[in-house]
Amino acid sequence: MASVTENELKSMTQEERVKALGMTSEQLTGRSMFMEFDPGETERFEYPWAPKVDFNKRTELDTVDMTSTEVNSKIRELMSEGYGTIVLKNPRGKHSLAVGILSKLNLIIEGSTGYFGVGLIDGPNVRINGRVGWSCGENMMSGTVLIEKNAGSTFGAAIRGGDLVCKGSVGSRTGIDMKGGTIIVGGDTGALSGFMMQRGRMIVCGNAGKNLGDSMYDGTIYIGGEIKSFGVDAVEAE
């Protein structure tokens, strides 16, 4: 890099100074690191590279002969082309489908998915017309996810925002380490639900298994049916 005098720097624009000094700049990414989001952050927040999509522009994708990686790459390609409503056909229990979507999108999955589906999302609305495996919606930041049937264990692990809804029953450790958002279960939930819960709310219309709310820091759990037992640090209230 050639030497630059102080007077030369003063006469340059900001962009010229950055280039002359060999500096680089890059967009900061990701959410705030606060335990709970600023209530207005979701509406204001967007990723600078997120594609602009048209919800009225709709397409279907048959995933029967595709790997999960290929499906996820194709979703991003379709979004870059402006598609705002995407229907995935024949998912056949594939793992890690629709992860890391950081943009507004209407996504409809016609069938069941495997482990870690729709994790790390920030913005999309997802409907799954089937069942889901373990850890659906893990680390979700915003958006909505609706599962028409049942879900496996660790449903909504570590979510920080958004609405995660399962019309059926879910497995154990629902909402483990959740830091915000809302989890709604139409049926029952298994043991250790709300384990190490920090914030947010969980609404279960049915029964809850053993050790509900074990090691909770904060947050609220509503149970419509019976509770098998409470965990350490859980406090019952009416």
Give the predicted meaning of each segment.
Residues 1-238:
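Long, distal/terminal scaffolding or interaction modules
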